[in-house]
């Protein structure tokens, strides 16, 4: 066996992959918790639906890849929001964005 192909002790391929999927789930959950205080829930839900429709249904990618693409888009949205001068906590638009009424359901399995 080539030493470059050896897996370090305590890190089998399955554990490494499982850890990556766990990290992805934790990161998306935390991002959603923060995002609902800064972005409208409708926007978050629409981004999730669009990612799922395009990456999962149209392109046939895995659900993990779809979640990864959702994570990238939401990180960009939060970055733009912060760079434009976030005043959410000062103005207090509250959780769920600016629209009144009951919020739509959160992205499936993510919040």
UniProtKB/Swiss-Prot annotation:
Gene Ontology CC entries for this record: host cell nucleus; virion component
Keywords, in A-Z order: AIDS, Host nucleus, Host-virus interaction, Inhibition of host innate immune response by virus, Viral immunoevasion, Virion
Pfam families reported for this sequence: VPR
Gene3D superfamilies in alphabetical order: 1.20.5.4730
Location(s), subcellular: Virion; Host nucleus
Key word Transmembrane helix present: no
Biological processes, Gene Ontology terms: symbiont-mediated suppression of host innate immune response; viral life cycle
Function: Plays a role in nuclear translocation of the viral pre-integration complex (PIC), thus is required for the virus to infect non-dividing cells. Targets specific host proteins for degradation by the 26S proteasome. Acts by associating with the cellular CUL4A-DDB1 E3 ligase complex through direct interaction with host VPRPB/DCAF-1. This change in the E3 ligase substrate specificity results in the degradation of host SAMHD1. In turn, SAMHD1 depletion allows viral replication in host myeloid cells by preventing SAMHD1-mediated hydrolysis of intracellular dNTPs necessary for reverse transcription.
Family: Belongs to the lentivirus VPX protein family.
Subunit structure: Interacts with the P6 region of unprocessed GAG. Interacts with host VPRBP/DCAF1, leading to change substrate specificity of the CUL4A-DDB1 E3 ligase complex. Interacts with host NUP153.
Protein name: Protein Vpx
Encoding gene, per UniProt annotation: vpx
């Amino acid at each position: 066996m080539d030493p470059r192909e050896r897996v370090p002790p305590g890190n089998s391929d399955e554990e490494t992959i499982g850890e990556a999927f766990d990290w992805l789930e934790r990161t998306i959950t935390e991002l959603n918790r923060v995002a609902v205080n800064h972005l409208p829930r409708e926007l978050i839900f629409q981004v999730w639906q669009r990612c799922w429709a395009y990456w999962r249904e149209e392109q046939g990618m895995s659900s993990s890849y779809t979640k990864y693409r959702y994570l990238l888009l939401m990180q960009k949205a939060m970055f733009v929001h912060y760079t434009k001068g976030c005043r959410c906590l000062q103005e207090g638009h509250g959780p769920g964005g600016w629209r009144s009424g009951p919020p739509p359901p959160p992205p499936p399995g993510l919040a």
